[in-house]
């Protein structure tokens, strides 16, 4: 059997024959150390009880113990039994701790299962978000590339249009009195504006699709961030904010230790109460075996109850009355002197430890209250974390319901993107075709200028040839004139007038005219004199209105079959 706690530095004697000598230890200060220390208890009365120290037993004299001292110890023992409420409280704490631990295990398992599932779903949602981000980034890169491509194509088109705008049409291609024009006046600018408007509309649609998808991504990010924060908050709730007496928050790993400490504390307090009960029984026996002890005990109990109102009432009448009724009318029962001496020796020795045992019960209960508070804090934190995790699960259901709309938004964004890209590619191709057409137009105009110059050169050569021919004809006409005059002088006096008519006919005049008259005058070659339009030879081609080259033909002004025709 164990003994009461004692603050005495020397070890006490054994309380029973079966007890081995044990040193007394200081009052218990922590339930966590209770498992390592033996629990003290009062020694029970035993008929064969042997004293721990023979010298002490021989020196002790039961007759020297006044009855007042025994009654005092009896009342103190009875008063110590009021700690039964503390023991009951300790039992309630231990029972509550076991119930909380059972519920804690269930809640922890459910929370861990829910949390694992939510984290897996959250990981899938993050993967979905990364896929949407890649689609958004690819679209953004394509958008920038499209803008650069459009700027380049529009810049090339605008450059060639500027060249057309700065290129003035030569006078030779304009009607008389017509205002100056540039090459851009010969093309339809509405086509370019239509292409540009179509491109602007496509860019606007791409921007709208990008903005709409960006809004969906922001809402998705908000959902993920809210769910992640809620999960972090739920995890943080599993760690209580309260602190233990040592200044540190309780840890879930300490729950087994707390349960063990509460169970050991409850068991230790029950042992203390059992020891106090045995000590009270021995005090009752000691008083009953002492002459006048029962009556004095009842009187002192009544006086103690009436004198101190703050103190709990002490009632021993039931115990003493029952013993007295069992023992008959006598107020005291004789007992073997040796047994009585041993009994009183144990009572006197244990009486000094009653206060220590009661104080130890209070200390143990105080520590149990703190341990129970720590365990309750962990349980409350676990319950709060479980409730928060359930809230996260509800949030996950809502996010999952909206996830389909986010996926649909991604598909819509990609479809709109592809459609508008196809439209933009078509319009860019149109811009390239317009650029090529305008370049061809500009090159054709340059070729047209070269063709005009070439034709001018050809007509100049033709003019030169006809001028030389005219000079030869003029020489022939002059020679013919002289020959005619010489012939007339030689034979004119001899030829009759009837025969002279054909010979006297003037030399025919010739002119070179184009099949299609593209000039204001023509070259006429007369046998008698200069050409009528000699001064207009150099300017005839400058008044050209058609780019075609005329095919000249030679025809007589007065040819055969004309009026006055006579054979030569």
From Swiss-Prot:
Region called Disordered, residue ranges: 1-59, 522-568
GO cellular component: Atg1/ULK1 kinase complex; phagophore assembly site; phagophore assembly site membrane
Cell compartments where the protein resides: Cytoplasm; Preautophagosomal structure membrane
Chief localisation class: cytoplasm
Topology versus the membrane: Peripheral membrane protein
Ranges of Basic and acidic residues composition bias in the record: 522-546
Flavoprotein keyword on record: no
GO molecular function terms listed in the Swiss-Prot or TrEMBL record: molecular adaptor activity; protein kinase activator activity
Pfam families cross-referenced by the UniProt entry: ATG17_like
Entry similarity comment: Belongs to the ATG17 family.
Its job: Autophagy-specific protein that functions in response to autophagy-inducing signals as a scaffold to recruit other ATG proteins to organize pre-autophagosomal structure (PAS) formation. Modulates the timing and magnitude of the autophagy response, such as the size of the sequestering vesicles. Plays particularly a role in pexophagy and nucleophagy.
Name of the molecule in the record: Autophagy-related protein 17
Source organism of this protein record: Neurospora crassa (strain ATCC 24698 / 74-OR23-1A / CBS 708.71 / DSM 1257 / FGSC 987)
Gene it is expressed from: apg-9
């Amino acid at each position: 059997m164990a003994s009461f706690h004692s603050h005495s530095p020397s070890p006490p004697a054994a309380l029973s024959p079966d007890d081995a000598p044990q040193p007394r230890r200081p009052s218990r200060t922590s339930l966590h150390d209770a498992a390592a220390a033996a629990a003290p208890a009062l020694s029970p009365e035993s008929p064969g009880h042997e004293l721990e120290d023979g010298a002490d037993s021989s020196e002790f004299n039961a007759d020297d113990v006044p009855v007042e001292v025994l009654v005092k110890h009896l009342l103190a023992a009875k008063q110590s039994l009021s700690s039964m409420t503390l023991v009951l409280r300790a039992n309630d704490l231990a029972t509550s701790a076991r119930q909380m631990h059972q519920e804690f295990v269930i809640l922890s398992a459910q929370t861990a299962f829910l949390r694992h599932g939510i984290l897996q779903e959250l990981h899938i949602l993050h993967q979905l978000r990364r896929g949407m981000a890649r689609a958004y980034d690819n679209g953004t890169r394509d958008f920038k590339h499209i803008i650069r491509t459009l700027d380049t194509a529009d810049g090339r088109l605008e450059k060639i249009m500027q060249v057309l705008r700065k290129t003035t049409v030569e006078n030779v291609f304009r009607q008389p009195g017509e205002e100056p024009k540039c090459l851009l006046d010969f093309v339809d600018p509405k086509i370019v504006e239509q292409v540009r408007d179509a491109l602007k509309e496509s860019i606007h649609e791409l921007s709208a699709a990008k903005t709409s998808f960006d809004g969906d991504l922001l809402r998705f990010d908000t959902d993920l961030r809210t769910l992640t924060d809620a999960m972090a908050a739920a995890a943080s709730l599993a760690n209580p904010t309260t602190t233990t007496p040592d200044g540190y928050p309780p840890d879930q790993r300490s729950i087994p230790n707390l349960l063990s400490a509460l169970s050991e504390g409850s068991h230790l307090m029950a042992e203390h109460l059992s020891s106090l009960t045995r000590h009270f029984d021995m005090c009752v026996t000691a008083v009953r075996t002492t002459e006048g002890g029962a009556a004095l005990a009842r009187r002192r109990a009544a006086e103690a109850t009436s004198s101190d109102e703050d103190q709990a009432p002490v009632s021993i009448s039931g115990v003493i009355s029952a013993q007295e009724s069992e023992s008959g009318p006598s107020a005291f029962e004789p007992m073997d002197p040796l047994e009585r001496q041993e009994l009183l020796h144990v009572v006197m020795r244990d009486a000094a430890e009653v206060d220590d045992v009661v104080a130890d019960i209070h200390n143990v209960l105080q520590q149990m209250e703190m341990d129970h508070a720590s365990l309750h804090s962990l349980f409350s934190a676990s319950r709060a974390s479980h409730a928060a995790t359930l809230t996260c699960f509800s949030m996950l259901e809502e996010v999952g319901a909206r996830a389909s709309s986010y996926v649909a938004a991604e598909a819509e964004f990609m479809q709109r993107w592809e459609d508008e890209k196809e439209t933009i590619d078509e319009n860019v191709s149109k811009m390239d075709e317009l650029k090529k057409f305008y370049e061809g137009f500009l090159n054709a105009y340059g070729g047209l200028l070269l063709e005009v110059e070439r034709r001018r050169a050809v007509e100049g050569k033709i003019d030169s040839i006809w001028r030389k021919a005219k000079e030869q004809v003029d020489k022939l006409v002059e020679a013919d004139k002289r020959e005619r005059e010489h012939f007339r002088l030689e034979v004119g006096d001899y030829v009759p007038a009837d025969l002279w008519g054909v010979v006297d006919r003037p030399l025919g005049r010739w002119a070179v005219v184009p099949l299609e008259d593209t000039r204001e005058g023509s070259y006429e070659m007369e046998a008698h004199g200069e050409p009528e339009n000699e001064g207009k030879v150099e300017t005839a081609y400058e008044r050209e209105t058609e780019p075609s080259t005329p095919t000249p033909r030679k025809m007589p002004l007065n040819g055969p079959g004309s009026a006055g025709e006579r054979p030569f």
